[in-house]
């Protein structure tokens, strides 16, 4: 259990002027970078973008009206640096562009704790280290902000050198619209470990494998691939929407009695206790740093394993069937 508790912080808990009174350098203009930069600017925050000279995102940021500098120039100019490039790239960007341009009293912000948790980045003393992590992809963060809503977030303080890091984190969260929905305090360790576990065991790895096995089981038994696709993949969104809206209980309330009964008697046989034991092993690899080491080692050597695994996944028959069906039906257009 977390020692922090489960208080939800909202807009009334934050002073927006704190982030409005500093210059923010957003390093990176990808999914989170573009969304957070645009939301901050629309909240009255002064923002510059830090991108390499040959970055494919440079024109997009300039077209959005931002001043675009080299990462080292942006870091030197700003008082808060939001490092929002992908995890594997953060070490090099930090070492080459940020590390020597941090001044005492500056703040370094992340939206995922990976590099701090596993020690790939160690900021100097005298610098605030904080995290604001929206619980949704960048396009959702931007869309919800424009619709006068917000994407929930978690935030964390790793190093409070200034004595105001907590308030600064809430101010930043308010600036990107997260406090409209609410934010929960966590730690870099908790955010990193639970985020990686959720991705690997449930949301991405576990779910994708479950879908593929379900599809293969039906097709191997002689059913049409198109029908199998509908039953194990397409209808998933309908169930997920219900779960997000009202938890597992709303999903059970909304489905037929046949489906509900079947879920009780068959679900635990598909996802049995061995699955939970495997989940515990995966969590152990995350907590020990074994996964991080494997991932970074592969990235540093050219991402050969990652590329091979991606190619294998792309060749699964469900991909071709899905692409063909989505091209035929109006719901995908």
From Swiss-Prot:
GO biological process: isoleucine biosynthetic process; L-valine biosynthetic process
Role noted for this protein: Involved in the biosynthesis of branched-chain amino acids (BCAA). Catalyzes an alkyl-migration followed by a ketol-acid reduction of (S)-2-acetolactate (S2AL) to yield (R)-2,3-dihydroxy-isovalerate. In the isomerase reaction, S2AL is rearranged via a Mg-dependent methyl migration to produce 3-hydroxy-3-methyl-2-ketobutyrate (HMKB). In the reductase reaction, this 2-ketoacid undergoes a metal-dependent reduction by NADPH to yield (R)-2,3-dihydroxy-isovalerate.
Domain KARI N-terminal Rossmann: from-to ranges: 6-186
Residues that hold NADP(+) according to the record: 29-32, 52, 55, 57, 87-90, 138
Domain KARI C-terminal knotted per the UniProt entry, residue ranges: 187-332
Residues at which substrate binds: 256
EC number: 1.1.1.86
List of catalytic residues: 112
Keywords assigned: Amino-acid biosynthesis, Branched-chain amino acid biosynthesis, Magnesium, Metal-binding, NADP, Oxidoreductase
Gene Ontology molecular-function annotations: ketol-acid reductoisomerase activity; magnesium ion binding; NADP binding
Details of cofactor binding: Binds 2 magnesium ions per subunit.
Superkingdom, taxonomy of origin: Bacteria
Database matches in HAMAP family: IlvC
Pfam families hit by this protein: KARI_C, KARI_N
Pathway: Amino-acid biosynthesis; L-isoleucine biosynthesis; L-isoleucine from 2-oxobutanoate: step 2/4; Amino-acid biosynthesis; L-valine biosynthesis; L-valine from pyruvate: step 2/4
Binding positions (Mg(2+) 1): 195, 199
Name the record gives this protein: Ketol-acid reductoisomerase (NADP(+))
């Amino acid at each position: 259990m977390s020692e922090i508790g489960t208080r939800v912080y909202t807009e009334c808990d934050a002073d927006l002027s704190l982030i409005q009174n500093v210059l923010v350098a957003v390093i990176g203009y990808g999914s989170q970078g573009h969304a957070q930069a645009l939301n901050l600017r629309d909240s009255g925050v002064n923002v510059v973008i830090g991108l390499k000279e040959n970055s494919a995102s440079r024109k997009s940021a300039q077209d959005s009206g931002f001043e675009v500098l080299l990462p080292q120039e942006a870091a030197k100019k700003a008082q808060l640096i939001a490092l929002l490039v992908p995890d594997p790239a953060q070490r090099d960007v930090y070492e080459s562009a940020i590390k020597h341009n941090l001044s005492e009293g500056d703040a370094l912000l992340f939206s995922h704790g990976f590099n701090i948790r596993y020690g790939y980045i160690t900021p100097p003393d005298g610098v605030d280290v904080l995290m604001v992590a929206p619980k949704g992809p960048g396009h959702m963060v931007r869309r919800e902000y424009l619709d006068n809503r917000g994407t929930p977030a978690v935030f964390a303080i790793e190093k409070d050198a200034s004595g105001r890091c907590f308030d600064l984190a809430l101010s930043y969260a308010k600036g990107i619209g997260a406090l409209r929905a609410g934010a929960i305090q966590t730690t870099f360790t908790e955010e990193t470990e639970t985020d990686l576990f959720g991705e690997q065991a449930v949301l991405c790895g576990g779910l994708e494998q479950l879908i593929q096995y379900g599809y293969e089981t039906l097709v191997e038994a002689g059913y049409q691939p198109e029908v199998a696709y509908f039953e194990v993949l397409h209808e998933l969104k309908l169930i997920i929407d219900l779960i997000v809206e009202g938890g597992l209980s709303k999903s059970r309330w909304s489905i037929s009695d046949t489906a509900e009964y079947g879920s009780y008697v068959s679900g635990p046989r598909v996802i049995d206790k061995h699955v939970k034991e495997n989940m515990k092993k995966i969590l152990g690899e995350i907590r020990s740093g074994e996964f991080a080491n494997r991932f970074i080692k592969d990235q540093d050597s050219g991402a050969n394993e990652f590329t091979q695994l991606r190619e294998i996944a792309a060749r699964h028959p469900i991909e071709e069937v899905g692409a063909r069906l989505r091209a035929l039906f109006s719901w995908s257009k």
